[in-house]
Design a protein with these regions (language model features):
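N-terminal glycine-rich phosphate/pyrophosphate-binding loop and immediately adjacent elements
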Residues: 132-264, 388-391, 437-457, 463-495, ...
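Extreme N-terminal leader/targeting segments of oxidoreductases
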Residues: 4-8, 69-171, 705, 713-755, ...
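Core beta-strand elements of the Rossmann-like FAD/NAD(P) dinucleotide-binding domain
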Residues: 165-170, 404-416, 420
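Acidic/polar surface patches and capping/hinge elements
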Residues: 1-89
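Mid-to-C-terminal "cap/lid" subdomains and adjacent gly/pro-rich loops that border
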Residues: 358, 393-398, 408, 415-556, ...
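Conserved redox-cofactor binding core of oxidoreductases
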Residues: 84-85, 97-152, 271-366, 371-372, ...
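A glycine-rich dinucleotide-binding beta-alpha-beta segment and adjacent secondary-structure elements
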Residues: 135, 169, 318, 328-332, ...
């Protein structure tokens, strides 16, 4: 646990946690925080010397305390303990985690069982690697070594004005390599611009991925997956490393819905959002990364949700995905071992590398370098490059840049800077550069606040409420769940079924969606409510039997992104009254869906006891079971979503440097250029005017494509077509096939016309 905290928890939170541990290590401190539970035969004892029942009593007391800091302490201990216990393997257990067997979790596949890479899909690695510099792995000790390393990639290298400065030149520098940065780099380089990509994380080849949470969290997630508000009320999951979130996302690839595009065009001064430019951009990116419907087989996990929605008569649809329709290894959140997912490293980043771009990994972009004179278009200044410092590890260093001890600095001289470090890092980068755009940089943080509901299914069960002829759209029928009768949330296609029943797409456009999350054992253990040691042990012993539903809300309210004393991003967020009510609506629907699918026990990430559902011999709820379900739903409504009593998380962050037609209401103009500084463009999720209500990846990529295409055209460059680009209207057809527009609608699968299989820069392979 100490390793996890030291490497993944921000310094202020880390200090608070270690202070708590110090206080609890004394008898007086334990009495102060634990009351009479810290007394044994009338004498105070430090926490570690108390009997287990007393320790549990203290922590349970904190959970119910009216003092927010005690509630926070209970949540922090529970979360970190769950993550640490189930995340790390130990040599004594043969390289496995001793708790995996007890929870029925198999761990990573053995070499013999590992799904083999698809050679045609991994051809991109041979293109990408020769143009990649990994400063963390190479660790050049000084400027001379750094210059030699960069020169070996064909860059013209020179000395800067200060000792230790290493200067390279480009037409454009892209900060970040995820959905936004990858697309921007690919478009710009393919148009003939000299492009350098700066990425603070590292690159992992498919064959080198261990496929464990212990590796993925610290190396492929921001803050190791522990990126919370100061009060711990919200936790953010965001990708890190070369390829960003596209390397660990759950494959959901929704084209931007029409009602969102209309809102952005009409209310935010962005007419291109409903015009042919955005249509073309969306078709290009959806085609290149291989978006389609028609999953070959829904996992047990998704089948449970589909059966429950069928039982309720609610809308259910199939999620478009950017992977092969037969891909079902369940490892997407730990990195794709086969290349079957169209992430940036197999698509646009590889296109960029093939066109001559250089990707510099392990380079932390500190700030934009600007001219002293006003720009020709009237903006206060113009970009002339980026200052970056080398990273010694993927972990963000909790010291000021001038104190990090780097023997050299990297200066990329370029008149065009593309900020694409993600919704959390882009505003921090701009703020460190003095670019605030009238205060709009860092405002308007939207996160799609999410929580989870889960149900336990008995061995050998048949899902209730769906006749054998029914099917979840686009794939295998929901009833019965096959195999041993266990759900195995970590196995099969991660995300394929969803519901927009209460999303209000035809009205306000704001409301909850239901999907299935990717759930491996440590992430689940860190999130589930804790009701005591015995209850937690029993809960985790049934890990294969649980099926979970993710409730995602399109938020109308917003938060704020700010920087700490080291210049790193931190954030404040708590859902508005409307958004919390939307979450409760989604929680109710999810509970009813799991009950309708045949669960014998349901619970949620709210601090409420689980509900056992009494069923008759036919599997249907008894009258008593039905009454108990209604009472449980009433309790959920009365409890509501409360800070640190409901686990709230986010996998989608948006809006912190938004586009708009009015500089008084946005950070960037419709072309993506900041209102304050010429030549600085935002092309990631930060550019969203509002939240999108669906997985934002394809919208990010489309915005990045449109912004980069515009810059290239204004530079007098021709922008070539993208391999596998869809014909006009194909994205709309995919979205229509996905959600159907009605309850339980079943639409035929829509294949893409190209994808990631055609090799880098070549024509895509059609999917049927």
């Amino acid at each position: 646990m100490v390793e996890l905290i030291s490497n993944q928890v921000p310094l202020p939170d880390r200090d608070e946690f270690f202070l708590l541990m110090k206080v609890l290590d004394s008898a007086v401190g334990t009495v102060a925080l634990g009351g009479t539970a810290a007394l044994v035969k009338g004498r105070p004892r430090p926490f570690r010397k108390l009997p287990q029942d007393r320790r549990e009593r203290i922590v349970r007391g904190w959970q119910a305390s009216p003092i927010p800091d005690l509630v926070k302490a209970a949540k922090g201990i529970k979360t970190l303990a769950g993550l640490a216990l189930f995340q790390f393997a130990t040599p004594a257990a043969g390289g496995r985690n001793p708790y995996w067997d007890g929870s029925g979790y198999p761990g990573p596949p053995s070499a013999a069982d590992r799904r083999p890479p698809v050679p045609s899909k991994l051809a991109s690695e041979a293109v990408l690697l020769p143009r990649l510099v990994d400063l963390i792995a190479a660790a050049p000790p000084d400027a001379s070594a750094a210059k030699a390393l960069l020169a070996a990639k064909g860059l013209a290298v020179s000395d800067g004005d200060k000792p230790g400065d290493v200067v390279v030149e480009a037409d454009a520098v892209v900060v970040g390599s995820g959905a936004g940065g990858g697309v921007a780099a690919g478009v710009l380089a393919s148009a003939g611009l000299r492009v350098i990509v700066l990425e603070k994380g590292q690159y992992w080849k498919a064959a080198d991925l261990p496929l464990t949470e212990a590796h993925a969290f610290p190396n492929m997630y921001e803050r190791g997956g522990v990126f919370s508000t100061r009060d711990l009320s919200v936790n953010v999951l965001a990708g890190a490393g070369v390829g960003g979130g596209t390397r660990i996302n759950w494959c959901a690839s929704f084209p931007t819905p029409a009602h969102v595009r209309k809102e952005w065009a009409e209310e935010h001064g962005l007419p291109d959002m409903v015009g042919p430019r955005f249509d073309r951009a969306l078709a290009a990116v959806c085609g290149r990364v291989g978006v389609s419907t028609g999953v070959a087989a829904h996992s047990n996990h998704n089948a449970c949700l589909g059966a429950g929605l069928e039982a309720l008569g609610d809308h259910r649809g199939e999620i478009p995905r950017n992977c092969d329709n037969a891909a079902d290894c369940g490892m997407c959140c730990l990195g794709c071992p086969t290349g079957e997912r169209g992430d940036m490293t197999h698509t646009f980043l590889a296109d960029a590398a093939g066109a001559g771009a250089v990707i510099i990994a392990g380079a932390h972009a500190e700030r934009v370098l600007t001219s002293k004179a006003a720009a020709a278009d009237g903006r206060k200044a113009g970009a002339v490059g980026v200052l970056a410092t080398p990273m010694s590890s993927p972990i963000i260093q909790e010291v000021a840049p001038r104190k990090r001890g780097a023997a050299w600095r990297l200066i990329v001289r370029a008149p065009r800077v593309f900020a694409a470090g993600g919704t959390m890092h882009t505003p921090a980068f701009l703020k460190r550069s003095g670019i605030t755009c009238g205060g709009w940089v860092g405002r308007n943080l939207r996160i799609h606040p999410a929580t989870i509901v889960y149900g336990r299914f008995p061995a050998g069960f048949k899902a209730q409420g769906a006749p054998p002829s029914a099917a979840v759209p686009g794939g295998a029928g929901a009833p019965p769940v096959p195999g041993t009768g266990t759900v195995k949330m970590w196995s099969g296609a991660i995300m394929s079924a969803f519901s927009n029943q209460h999303a209000d797409w035809e009205g306000t456009g704001y409301g909850p969606m239901l999907m299935t999350p990717s759930m491996h054992v440590a992430g689940f253990a860190g999130l589930v409510p804790w009701q005591g040691g015995a209850a937690f042990k029993s809960f985790m012993a049934h890990f294969p039997d649980w099926s979970s539903v993710l409730v995602i809300t399109r938020d109308r309210g917003s938060g704020t992104l700010f920087t700490d004393r080291f210049g790193h991003p931190r954030y404040k967020y708590w859902g508005s009254k409307f958004d919390r009510a939307s979450m409760v609506t989604g929680i109710e629907q999810a509970v009813r869906a799991l009950a309708g699918a045949g669960a014998v026990e349901v619970g949620s990430f709210m601090s409420l006891p689980h509900l056992d559902l009494e069923r008759g011999g036919d599997g249907a709820l008894t009258p008593a079971g039905a009454a108990a379900l209604e009472a449980y739903v009433a309790t959920i409504k009365a409890e509501g979503v409360r800070k640190n009593r409901t686990a709230v998380m986010s996998a989608h962050q948006m809006g912190t440097a938004r586009l708009g037609g009015d500089p008084k209401r946005s950070a960037c103009d419709p072309d993506g250029q900041t209102w304050q500084t010429a030549g600085v463009y935002v092309c990631d999720g930060a550019a969203f005017p509002t939240s999108s209500g669906l997985n934002p990846m394809m919208t990010i990529e489309a915005i990045a494509y449109m912004v980069a295409e515009g810059v290239a055209l204004r530079a007098g460059k021709a922008v070539p077509g993208v391999a596998g680009a869809m014909p006009a209207g194909q994205c709309a057809a995919i979205l229509e096939s996905s959600y159907g527009g009605g309850r339980a609608a079943v639409k035929p699968p829509v294949p893409v016309c190209g994808g990631v299989g055609g090799g880098v820069g070549g024509g895509g392979v059609a999917r049927a």
